[in-house]
Amino acid sequence: MLDSLRAAASTAVLPRAYFRYAASRPAALLLAGGLALAVAAPAAAQQESDGQERSASDQQEQAGVELYDAPQPSGSEDGTWTLNWENDIFGGTDRNYTNGNRLSYVSPEAGMGGLHGPIARALLFADDADRVRWGLAIGQSMYTPRNTEARRPLPDQHPYAGWAYGEYSVYAQDDDSLRMIGLQAGMVGPSARGEWVQNNVHRAIGTDESNGWDNQLEDEPAFVLMYERKERALIAGEYLGLQLDVVPHVGVALGTLRTQASAGATLRFGDDLKRDFGPPRIRPAMGGSGYFEATPSFNWYLFVGAEGRAVARNLFLDGNTWKDSASVERKPFVAELQYGLVMQYDNLQLAWTFVTRSRQFDEQERPQQFGAVSLSVKF
C-alpha cells in the first residue's frame, strides 16, 4: 500500500512549483498528501481486487480439477436393464425346464408418487425413509419331455408347455432389507410360441427339433401374485477389502400359474456386497434385487444359495385348469441349490449361475441341472 502511495505521488499531475510552495505551508502540504492519497487509493484497491479475483479463480479451477478427477459412477441415478437367459444346455440335457428368456427394467428411486407409491405403502409397509422403485418385465419360458423325438403323448414325462408373460413389480428397500411385490400375467399354450422359438433356434444351430409340440398344454391365460422379503446380514467385516454376508429370504406366490411358499438363504463372499441383494434370476428361482448400485471401480463376489419350496400348484405339471391335458404327479416339496459369480464395473454387471433343482414330479428320473446368465446395465 505504501509503495502504491509513493508511486502515485511521484506520478501525480501537479506542478513542481506547487511542491516547493507546499513545503513552506503546512496546509498546502496536507492538501498535496490528500491529492496523492486520492490518486493512489483506487490503484491500490484495484490491485488488491485483481489479486483476490485471481485467487478465487485459481481455487475454482483447482476444485474443478478435483471434481473431474474424482471417479463418479456413470449410472448412479439411472434405471437398470437386465437380460436373463437360462438353459439346460449348461447341464448337458434338453428336457423339463429347457429355456427361459427375460428382459426387465427397474426404475431408479421413484419416491411415493404414481401407482407404485400407494402399493408400497399399503402392501410393503413402506414409509418416506424407504427407497421405492418399480419394475416392468417381459419373458418366455419353455418346457419339454425327456424324449423330444416322439410325436405321441408321453404321460410319464414333463408336458410340453410354453409361457409368455408380462410382469409389474414394486420394491421397497432400506439399508439391509428388501421387500418386493409383483404380478405376472400371460398365456400358457401355443399362443406363447414356445414351439416356434425352440425349433427355429434348433434349426439355426443345427440340432434336432422337438417333434411332440402338438401335445403341449392348451391355451390358457394365467397369473401369479408374488411377495418376497430379503435381509442382508454381515458375517465378517471388511478384511483385505473383502466381506462375507448372508441374505436370508422368504416368499409366497399365489395364482393359477403357481401357488407355493419358499424360504432360503444366499451366502456371498467378495467386495462391496451392499451393491445388491444377489444375482437376478427368472422366477420361481431365488433371485436378487433386479437392480444394483453403480460403482466407479471393479467389484466381484462369489455366492452359494439354497431354497426349499412347498408347492400347492404348478400349472406346467398339473396341466390345464379347465381342460383335459397332459399332466404328471407333482411332488409337494422342491429344493434348489445354486452357486456362481457376479462381476461389476461402473454401470455394468454380469452374473453366471449354475443351478441344481430336485425332482419335481414322481416320474422324473433325476434332479435337473441348468445354467443362468444375466447382463445388467444402468442407463
What are the functions of these language-model segments?
Residues 122-196:
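Long, hydrophobic/aromatic-enriched structural stretches that serve as scaffold segments
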Residues 146-150, 266-379:
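Outer membrane beta-barrel transmembrane domains
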Residues 67-78, 109-132, 173-180, 233-246, ...:
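Short loop/turn motifs that connect adjacent beta-strands in outer-membrane beta-barrel proteins
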Residues 81-87, 134-142, 183-189, 229, ...:
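Transmembrane beta-barrel strands of outer-membrane/channel proteins
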Residues 105-107, 140, 170-172, 229-233, ...:
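Residue-level signature of outer-membrane beta-barrel architecture
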Residues 40-41:
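N-terminal signal peptide c-region/cleavage motif recognized by signal peptidases
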Residues 95-101, 160-164, 179, 219-225, ...:
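Residues that define the transmembrane beta-barrel architecture of outer-membrane proteins
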Residues 152-156, 209-215, 251, 323-327, ...:
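Extracellular loop and loop/strand-boundary signature of outer-membrane beta-barrel proteins
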